Amino acid sequence: MNPSRPRVAAIGPLTPHLYTPTPARPLRAKLLRLRADTRVVPHAHPWGQVALSSTGVIRVTAPHGSYIVPPSRAVWIPPGVEHAVTVIEDAELLTLYLHQPRGRFGPARSAAESAGWRQCRVLEVSSLLLALALQLDASPDAPRAAPSRETLARERRLAALLLDELRRAAPVRLGIDLPQEKRLRRLCEAVIEAPSRHATLAAWAADTGASARTLTRLFRSELGTSFVQWRQQVLLARAVPLAARKLPMARIAAELGYASPSAFAAMVRRSVGAPPSRFLRASEGRQRV
């Protein structure tokens, strides 16, 4: 861990009540610039939310998962789900709030379509989706005067296109499952924060006060996987924003604690069945769709 790394600055929810979506304005936008190591404390609200960064990288943590979000990705957060946001790199955080009619989740047009939107999910962000989102009026409700009729009409047209684009956005399996058991939760959050700090479960166990055998059992019972497989998902998720910064493969491997690019490449092949160049290029290509 880098001793010169600044401490995380915790702040409260970023005035979501000033951007409340309604039937008249079903899709609201909020745009904020946040410094690295800022953490928005856990909170929830009664509407749906899409969190994305037009620049920089954020991490969204919910009860059952953690999601690293570079500009090519977004995270859907259903109504009422508690979540926290950590800024990994200086970011322009764009938040979309969705009014949710009773029985509907996300941009679904029917209760049947809502099934896939009842849980947090990572989505691809096309250039069209991002461009539409950036065109929405991101002004708060107060103390500003009510928007004009022309503004509302334009907002409704943009919202219709945005909701359609969200329905078309492909889900991406880059979320990191999180356990509920307290000891394992602490370990998992520490790994996500600094995945290259230790390579083995035994080394991480020394930091938690639980034995490696106990943690192995907890990984299986809580997450249905092994520590090695779970940590690989963390490393893959961390690799995506590094690739978005155009870092060479050797630098990405070193950042993630691998002794050589070939060792990193072997891990990627085992995990996703493709070489890292193809896996990471796909992540960048989706951003330009």
Regions found by a protein language model. Name each.
Residues 198, 202, 221-261, 281-289:
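Terminal helix-turn-helix DNA-binding modules in bacterial transcription factors
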Residues 1-12, 244-245, 266-289:
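…primarily DNA-binding HTH/wHTH and HhH modules…
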Residues 118-119, 143-211, 221-233:
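Short, Lys/Arg-enriched, Trp-marked, Pro/Gly-tolerant hinge/linker segments that flank
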Residues 64-79:
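Short acidic-glycine-tyrosine-enriched beta hairpin
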Residues 72, 215, 219, 263-264, ...:
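Short hydrophobic/aromatic patch on the recognition helix
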